[in-house]
A protein has these predicted regions:
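N-terminal segments that cap or nucleate solenoid repeat domains
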Residues: 1-37
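Glycine-rich hexapeptide-repeat left-handed beta-helix
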Residues: 1-12, 46-54, 60-62, 67, ...
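Generic amphipathic, hydrophobic interface segment in small proteins and small subunits
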Residues: 31-55
Length: 178
């Protein structure tokens, strides 16, 4: 794990946030409390600022970056699926879900409880309205919206990652060290 300053900018990491040993967090990065940063994730605050709210999960091999002098902003309880790339987004609002392998590009705006499907590409400046689902390349917003049942299910899934952030510091024991 690399948690490092870059040109005088040091990551700020909230209480109870877990960063996997193979993840990298450096530069102007703020992580809220209770976040889970998975294996291979790269959160790069070398060009611009990265701000994640509380209880976010950044799954395996994600990349989060910002343009020089700009900020990538991510709300609370956001799930970023395995292998997703988040680049210089204007805002990913609370409870949003970014599917595995999705790309969310510059100045995109993802609404509260919005879902970006697996492998989707959200283009520069594109807006995904709250509680809507976007899929495809390029991402298209579906008429179908997120149901209360779906929200309840994802609330449980999101809590699983908050629980992992508490369990990993003691539970993760590399072979030969336990």
């Amino acid at each position: 794990m690399t948690i490092a300053s870059f040109e005088g900018q040091t990551p700020r990491i909230g209480a109870g946030t877990y960063i996997h040993p193979s993840a990298d967090v450096f530069g102007s990065v703020t992580l809220g409390q209770g976040c889970w940063i998975g294996p291979g994730a790269r959160i790069r605050g070398d060009y611009g600022d990265i701000v994640l709210g509380d209880y976010c999960s950044v799954e395996d091999n994600c990349v989060i970056h910002a343009r020089p002098g700009e900020q990538t902003s991510i709300g609370n309880w956001v799930t970023i699926g395995h292998g997703a790339v988040i680049h210089n987004v204007e805002m990913i609002h609370d409870y949003a879900i970014i599917g595995m392998g999705a790309v969310v590009s510059d100045w995109a705006l993802i609404g509260e409880w919005a879902v970006v499907g697996e492998g989707a590409v959200v283009r520069q400046g594109q807006e995904i309205p709250p509680e809507h689902i976007a899929v495809g390349v390029p991402a298209k917003v579906l008429e179908k919206t997120v149901s209360e049942e779906y929200k309840a299910q994802w609330t449980r899934f999101k809590q699983t990652y908050v629980d992992l952030a508490r369990r990993y510091p003691e539970g993760w024991v590399p072979e030969g060290e336990g």
